[in-house]
C-alpha cells in the first residue's frame, strides 16, 4: 500500500502536469494511522514498479474524475436533451478520454544492490494539437454570421469530430517520474520513506 502522503504528492504532480490546479478533498485528508503504517513490500523491484504504475494511474484518474465531472457541462445538457444514444456514448467516451487520459507505464528499472530507482513514463493527449485540429476544422461544425457577429455551432458534428480525433490519435509522452525504492533487512523492496 502506498503511504498516503506520498500518494498526495504524486496526485499533485500529475494534476499540475494535466494543468489542473484544484485539489480534491480526499487529497487533503490527513492519513490515518493504518495508512501511514503500511507500506507494501515486494519480492522484486520489477513487481513493485508494475504495481506502483497501476497505483499512479488510478490516483491520476481518480483525482481528475473528482475534480472534473465533464469537459463541458453545457454540452452535457444538450446531449441529454436530444436523446441520441450514439451521440451520448461518443460524448461520454470523449469526456472519459480527456478527463482520465493519463497512462502510466514502467519506463526503466534500475537496481543497484539494496537501492532501486524506477522511472515511470506518463502519456496523454497533446491537447494543443487537439485544439489546433478542432480550430483548423471549425468549418465542419461552426458557421460564422459576420453580419450579426454570431457563431452557430453544430454540437453533434463537434462531438463526432472530437471523438474521432481522440479515438484515432496516439497519446504522446508528457513526462517521466522517478521513484526511489530500497531493499530492507527482510530482502523485500519498498518505497523510500
Annotate each predicted stretch with a short phrase:
Residues 87-158:
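Surface-exposed, charged secondary-structure patches
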Residues 52, 104-106, 118-120, 179-181, ...:
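Hydrophobic beta-strand residues in large extracellular and virion-surface proteins
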Residues 60-63, 125, 187-189:
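Primarily extracytoplasmic ectodomains and periplasmic/lumenal surface modules that are beta-strand-rich
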Residues 139-153, 164-193:
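Short beta-strand edge/turn micro-motifs at domain boundaries
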Residues 19, 108-110, 169-171:
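Generic marker of residues within folded, mature protein domains
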Residues 2-30:
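Sec-dependent N-terminal signal peptides of Gram-positive bacterial secreted proteins and lipoproteins
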Residues 30-105:
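Core segments of small alpha/beta cavity-forming domains
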Residues 68-74, 153-160, 172-177:
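Short glycine-rich, low-complexity/disordered patches
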Amino acid at each position: 500500500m502506498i503511504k498516503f502522503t506520498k500518494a498526495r504528492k504524486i496526485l499533485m504532480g500529475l494534476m499540475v502536469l494535466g494543468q489542473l490546479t484544484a485539489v480534491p478533498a480526499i487529497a487533503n485528508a490527513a492519513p490515518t494511522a493504518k495508512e501511514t503504517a503500511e507500506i507494501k513490500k515486494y519480492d522484486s523491484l520489477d513487481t513493485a514498479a508494475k504495481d506502483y504504475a497501476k497505483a499512479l494511474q488510478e490516483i491520476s484518474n481518480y483525482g481528475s474524475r473528482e475534480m472534473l465531472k465533464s469537459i463541458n457541462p453545457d454540452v452535457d445538457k444538450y446531449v441529454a436533451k436530444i436523446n441520441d444514444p450514439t451521440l451520448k456514448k461518443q460524448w461520454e467516451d470523449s469526456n472519459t478520454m480527456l478527463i482520465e487520459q493519463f497512462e502510466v507505464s514502467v519506463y526503466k528499472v534500475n537496481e543497484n544492490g539494496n537501492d532501486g530507482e524506477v522511472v515511470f513514463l506518463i502519456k496523454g493527449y497533446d491537447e494543443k494539437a487537439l485544439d489546433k485540429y478542432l480550430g483548423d476544422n471549425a468549418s465542419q461544425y461552426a458557421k460564422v454570421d459576420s453580419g450579426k457577429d454570431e457563431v452557430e455551432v453544430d454540437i453533434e458534428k463537434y462531438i463526432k469530430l472530437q471523438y474521432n480525433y481522440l479515438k484515432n490519435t496516439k497519446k504522446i509522452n508528457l513526462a517521466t517520474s522517478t521513484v526511489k525504492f530500497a531493499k530492507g533487512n527482510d530482502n523485500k523492496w519498498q518505497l523510500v520513506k
